[in-house]
Amino acid sequence: MGSGGGGCGRNGAVRQYIRSKVPRLRWTGELHCSFVQAIEFLGGQDKATPKLILQLMGVKGLTISHVKSHLQMYRCSRLGSHGTGRRSEMQPQLQRKHSCGADEQVPREFLCPPLKRTRMGTEATYKGMQGSQGISEMRTTGTQYCIDDYMQAMAMERRIKEEGLRWQRDAAAAAAADGGAAASNLQTVGCSVQESDPFKIIKPEVHHLGPVLKLQCSKVENSGFISSSTGTAARDQPEPPPLEKCSLSLSLGPDPKCMPAIASSPSESSCILSSSSRSFSDCSGNSGCLVAPGVNLELSMSICGS
């Protein structure tokens, strides 16, 4: 053991604890209230000293060592329960504020073991993490709601555009159909085309024939042809009352005078081309070419019922 009555020995051993014969002081509620009042009177736990607290308390049998140890425990409890103690104090106050019962004094926890303080700090940290996670979840949910609203608005706008385009197409189709019907109703002169191999004969409709066409028909009987300006003049004239029907026929065939010559040499001549003004033949064979007078082209026009 070390000499001198204190500290550690040369070997580093701890001095043996000697239990005092004086009984330990038990801090009752009254002593603790007196202790707290003395601290508050001195201006707080940082300004209060054990000597001044002991003088203000004035309790018989209370020593300065008792005040020192109790002040140290009080400071530790205040520092440890500063965050969680305030919440635990506010909850009973709120309950008392909203309840109809009598007010109850909130006990102050000044003796707090280290393990309990650690557990309380861990619970507070876990609750704080849960709160931050809930806030982040709320933000994520709000963002998701904004995205859903934006997608719904875009889909609605796209449907409106599609409906507008469909209405435009329907209106254009209806306008085209109405325009075709109006064009068919407003047509003043019409011609019916009849095909007969190998020629096409254009026959004017009967109810559109006018006086000018009658005059041209009489000229056709004398000259044997009809001018292209007849149809234009007929279109320019107003529509007269319906007249008698006319018939127009065109016949094409070989000249009867050339039939013996063609029948006599069918193999020597390959083709015969002729017209009303001039005639020539392009033939291939052993005996040469055969010149024919022409093809008989006659145009006749007569009034039906005459």
Swiss-Prot record:
Localisation: Nucleus
Function, in words: Transcriptional repressor that plays a role in the regulation of organ identity and spikelet meristem determinacy. Interacts with the TPR corepressors to possibly repress the expression of downstream target genes.
Listed name of the protein: Myb family transcription factor MOF1
The UniProt record lists the keyword Disulfide bond: no
Originating species: Oryza sativa subsp. japonica
Keywords of the record: Developmental protein, Differentiation, DNA-binding, Nucleus, Repressor, Transcription, Transcription regulation
Residues within the DNA-binding region(s): 50-75
Inactivation phenotype: Delayed transition from the spikelet to the floral meristem, inducing the formation of extra lemma-like and palea-like organs.
HTH myb-type domain segment(s): 19-79
Highest taxon above the source species: Eukaryota
Gene designation: MOF1
Gene Ontology cellular-component terms listed: nucleus
